[in-house]
Amino acid sequence: MPLPKIDDWRELSDEEISEQILATKKELFELRLQKATRQLEKPHLVRHAKHKLAQLMLLESQRTAAAKEK
């Protein structure tokens, strides 16, 4: 499974981005919990979740900065 591209997220609305951020944070928490209890079978999913979260937060900050300029 390749890392998600930022272009995949650009089409989402602001509300959907916020929802995705919350869902990704929850997913990352669950993955960390599995890692701590040694139940994580696919450790690369932690990296993917972090990457996805960074992309979504970047988009959110870019959109808020663009909204402030207007």
From Swiss-Prot:
Family assignment from sequence similarity: Belongs to the universal ribosomal protein uL29 family.
User: Biological process GO annotation list?
Assistant: translation
Q: Which NCBIfam families match?
A: L29
Q: Can you say what this protein is called?
A: Large ribosomal subunit protein uL29
Q: Which CDD domains match?
A: Ribosomal_L29_HIP (cd00427)
Record's GO cellular component terms: cytosolic large ribosomal subunit
Instruction: Extract one GO molecular function annotation from the record.
Output: structural constituent of ribosome
- Mention any Pfam family matching this sequence: Ribosomal_L29
Instruction: Could you list this entry's UniProt keywords, alphabetically sorted.
Output: Ribonucleoprotein, Ribosomal protein
Entries under InterPro entries matching the protein: Ribosomal_protein_uL29 (IPR050063), Ribosomal_uL29 (IPR001854), Ribosomal_uL29_sf (IPR036049)
